[in-house]
Structure formats: C-alpha cells, structure tokens
Design a protein with these regions (language model features):
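A structural micro-motif recognizing beta-strand termini
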Residues: 18-22
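C-terminal structural segments of small proteins and small subunits
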Residues: 45-76
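PDZ/PDZ-like peptide-tail recognition elements
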Residues: 1-7, 62-65
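Intrinsically disordered, low-complexity, charged/polar segments
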Residues: 4, 17, 73-76
Length: 76
C-alpha cells in the first residue's frame, strides 16, 4: 500500500518511493539520508501530530509532520 509518510502508521516499516517536496526541503531530507529506496519506520508522533520521529539508517530524527506529506512510501 502506498501512502504519504505523514500517514504511515507507527511501527510499520516502509520503503521511500519518491521525495516530492520543495527543493530546499528535498535537499535537507537527502542530507539526512531519506532518499528513494530507504527503509523507514515511524516511531513517535507528538500529541498534536505536529512532529513525527522517524527511524532510518540506524538514526532517529524528528521532523514537522507537514514536511512529510510530499514523501511517498510503500508499506512492506
């Protein structure tokens, strides 16, 4: 099943298919290592859903949930 990364349920592994964000954000995500083919797991969402913690490449980072809408992933 394909969804945007902001809608991926907690704890479900997925693979990044596309990073379709604005150039500046796309570069930032690429610098973190979030590129097509990367396996990612959503680990935490703040109570107001404004921040999401992601685990990928042995790292956990927290990003604004709204910034993840342009990232398409496929559940395994």
């Amino acid at each position: 099943m394909q969804v945007s990364l902001d809608r991926l349920p907690l704890g479900i592994p997925a693979v990044v298919l596309q990073v379709g964000c604005k150039q500046e954000l796309r570069c930032r995500l690429r610098d973190f290592g979030l590129v097509p083919g990367t396996e990612v797991v959503t680990r935490y969402r703040s109570p107001d859903r404004g921040v999401t913690a992601l685990e990928f490449r042995d790292t956990v980072i927290a990003l604004r949930t709204r910034d993840l809408k342009g990232v398409r992933v496929e559940w395994k």
